[in-house]
């Protein structure tokens, strides 16, 4: 059967939910799909279907990232539900990197919690351009003044991480009440629509990097029997058309191939564009030839490197970072795009050590090459915990 074509009639944005564990991110995602489905703009996704990876079921904690599709009257959204749990920051990093804007969910009954702060910090590091806040579980708070205080605290926290805290829309509601309701005139349901109006109005349509050379970080790789190998990911920049030559760059020697098909939401596209989540069919490539951490790119547009200068911010202990300084020879993981690579840090002449909270320049040598250019951002991690953030200031070799 021929696949249904994906129609591009509305602007497309990638958004998602972030926030502390159990503050209601997944419930809100389900409520959004329920009430947009009533307008024929989405398919309702129940809480369980969004929270669906088997190992998470027992604890009710979302570990993997769920992709949900819906529309408003103005836009088409691909929504990722990001895990809120500190153990799963890895997904948060690959997930938050996937957003043109985000909905920060905060339970009014708790106020901002450690992961709220951590996620705002990460949103800043991975450059999520804008945040809209959903103040959830307001039905559990009797005192309206308390809600005002939580809102004030949130605005201060956002300002602290260089988001425009005073301007950010904060919508109050109860995701659970909205999800359980069957009445479109219910005040809780109206708040879900109010939230989507705020997302439509406040999160700007991203400037797509359509004119830049094509590049897509590899998120996943699988085989479709009889058709070949498909790599999935979000197109970083440029346009890919069926028949285009591409290179697979990073981790191992660069390979040339041809893209023989582009798909999005299981529908065939003539082309994939910057910002789209797509699957690319690659000619003559085996599943074991490609891995997460590589990029698919226009030939000659990006090259693999192992050595670079970086500007790095080292998280404080309070931000969840290291408690102790590090020295030249420090060997953490450097998280580029979708994967961790071990590297060695060399501090500048005359710098003896780096303390948590410092902002420093350092030289980094990776053990495997990564497709790299100036301004590429990365996280520094130890045992799955983010301890720093950085940007490539100069490629050396």
Curated annotation (Swiss-Prot):
Instruction: Give the reactions, separated by semicolons, that this protein catalyses.
Output: GTP + H2O = GDP + phosphate + H(+)
Instruction: Provide the residue span(s) of the region labelled G1.
Output: 19-26
One Pfam family, short name please? GTP_EFTU
Q: Where in the cell is it found?
A: Cytoplasm
Report the GO terms under cellular component: cytosol
According to the UniProt record, where is the region G3? 81-84
Give the enzyme's EC designation.
3.6.5.3
Looking up PROSITE patterns in the UniProt record yields: G_TR_1, G_TR_2
Enzyme class, spelled out: hydrolase
Q: Which residues are listed for Mg(2+) binding in this entry?
A: 26
Keyword annotations of the record: Cytoplasm, Elongation factor, GTP-binding, Hydrolase, Magnesium, Metal-binding, Nucleotide-binding, Protein biosynthesis
**Which stretches of sequence are listed as region G5?**
174-176
Q: Which GO terms describe its molecular function?
A: GTP binding; GTPase activity; translation elongation factor activity
Stretches the record annotates as G4? 136-139
Where is this protein primarily located? cytoplasm
Q: Does the keyword Hydrolase apply?
A: yes
What assembly does the database describe for this protein? Answer: Monomer.
The record's family statement is:
Belongs to the TRAFAC class translation factor GTPase superfamily. Classic translation factor GTPase family. EF-Tu/EF-1A subfamily.
- Its name, as the record gives it, is Elongation factor Tu
């Amino acid at each position: 059967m021929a696949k249904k074509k994906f129609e591009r009639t509305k602007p497309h944005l990638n958004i998602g939910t972030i926030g502390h564990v159990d503050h209601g991110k997944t419930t809100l995602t389900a409520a959004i799909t329920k009430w947009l489905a009533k307008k024929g703009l989405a398919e309702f996704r129940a809480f369980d279907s969004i929270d669906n990876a088997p190992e998470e079921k027992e604890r009710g904690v979302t570990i993997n990232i769920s992709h949900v599709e819906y529309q408003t009257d103005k836009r088409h959204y691909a929504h990722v539900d990001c895990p809120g749990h500190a153990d799963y920051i890895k997904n948060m990093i690959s997930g938050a990197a996937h957003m043109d804007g985000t909905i920060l969910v905060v339970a009014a009954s708790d106020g901002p919690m450690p992961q709220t702060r951590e996620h705002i910090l990460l949103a800043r590091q991975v450059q999520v351009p804008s945040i809209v806040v959903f103040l959830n579980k307001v039905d559990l708070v009797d005192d309206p003044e308390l809600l005002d205080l939580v809102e004030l605290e949130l605005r201060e926290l956002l300002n602290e991480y260089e988001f425009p805290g005073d301007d950010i829309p904060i919508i109050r509601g109860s995701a659970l009440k909205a999800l359980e309701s069957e009445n479109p005139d219910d005040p809780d349901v109206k708040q879900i629509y109010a939230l989507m109006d705020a997302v439509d109005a406040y999160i700007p349509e991203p400037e797509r990097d359509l004119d830049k050379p094509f590049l897509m970080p590899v998120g996943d790789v699988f085989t479709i029997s009889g058709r070949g190998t498909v790599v999935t990911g979000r197109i970083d920049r440029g346009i890919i058309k069926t028949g285009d030559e591409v290179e697979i760059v990073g981790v191992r020697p660069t390979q040339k191939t041809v893209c023989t098909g582009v798909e999005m939401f299981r529908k065939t596209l003539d082309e994939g564009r910057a910002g789209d989540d797509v699957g690319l069919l690659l000619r003559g490539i085996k599943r074991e030839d490609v891995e997460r951490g590589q990029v698919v790119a226009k030939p000659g547009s990006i090259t693999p490197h192992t050595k670079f200068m970086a500007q790095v911010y080292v998280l404080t202990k309070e931000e969840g970072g290291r408690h102790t300084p590090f020295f030249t020879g420090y060997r953490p993981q450097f998280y580029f795009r979708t994967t961790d690579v071990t590297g060695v840090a060399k501090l500048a002449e005359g710098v003896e050590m780096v303390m948590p909270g410092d902002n420093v320049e350092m030289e980094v040598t990776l053990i495997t090459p990564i497709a790299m250019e100036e301004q590429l951002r990365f996280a520094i991690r130890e045992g799955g915990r983010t301890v720093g953030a950085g940007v490539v200031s100069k490629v050396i070799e």
